[in-house]
Swiss-Prot record:
This is Urease accessory protein UreF. It is found in: Cytoplasm. It comes from Rhizobium leguminosarum bv. viciae. Belongs to the UreF family. Signal peptide: none annotated. The gene is ureF. InterPro entries: UreF, UreF_sf.
Length: 223
């Protein structure tokens, strides 16, 4: 029975963080489009460095910490509301706020195909990592596995954005993804043991790129 539950958890995690899950993540670049326009990301190597920095020290790290906290607090509505409010406050730009809130809303709407009381415990609108953390926690998915899948999905989407922006080809994009595997695993382990005191970032250029994207005249992405 334990193996059956573990397999069920794996299948659900794979479904929820698959590119095919209907949340619209393909529409967002998280400021990468502006970074490319400004010459900060020009090839596969700089794309890998940009993404890796965000995962370890930027917005993706903060999302991982928030996911871990909502995973732990999935049975506590009041605590979930507090963490959800914090996640909104940490959005560093209008587009970043729009991105995380719309992804969270879409994730919850799609995940309701797997009924659970967690949907009643969550606020009506929550940021994406809060939604993923609470739902995976409610379904008994181990936090480290949820975090690894979440971060891998983030990196995959960022690599896809880089390919669409022309800074890497398909083969180079796959090499970037493969090269970041160990980093993803290390950050997932670190985030699983994190607390809210571990929130923080050191990615000023990425934050500025996200802000500058709001006034970019020609663009493919919403952020």
């Amino acid at each position: 029975m334990t193996r059956d539950r573990e397999l069920q958890a794996l299948l659900r995690l794979t479904a929820w963080l698959s590119p095919a899950f209907p949340i619209g993540g393909f529409a967002y670049s998280g400021g990468l489009e502006r970074a490319v326009a400004d010459g900060l990301v020009t090839d596969a190597a700089s794309l890998a460095a940009w993404i890796g920095t965000l995962v370890g020290n930027g917005s993706a790290w903060n999302d991982a910490v928030l996911l871990a906290e909502s995973h732990r607090q999935q049975a506590q509505p009041a605590r979930l509301a507090e963490v959800a409010a914090l996640a909104e406050a940490l959005a560093g730009s209008r587009e970043r706020h729009q991105e995380t809130m719309l992804l969270g809303e879409a994730f919850l709407a799609a995940a309701r195909a797997w009924p659970d009381g967690v949907f009643e415990r969550l606020p009506d609108k929550v940021a994406y990592p809060i939604a993923v953390g609470a739902v995976t926690g409610a379904h008994g998915i181990m936090p480290e596995k949820a975090l690894a899948a979440f971060l891998h999905a983030y990196v995959s989407q960022a690599v896809s954005s880089g390919i669409r922006l022309g800074v890497a080809g398909q083969r180079d994009g796959l090499a970037v993804l493969a090269g970041l595997e160990d980093h993803i695993a290390e950050v997932a382990r670190r985030a699983a043991a994190s607390a809210l005191d571990d929130l923080g970032s050191a990615t000023v250029q990425a934050d500025i790129a996200s802000l500058r994207h709001e006034t970019q005249a020609t663009r493919l992405f919403r952020s």
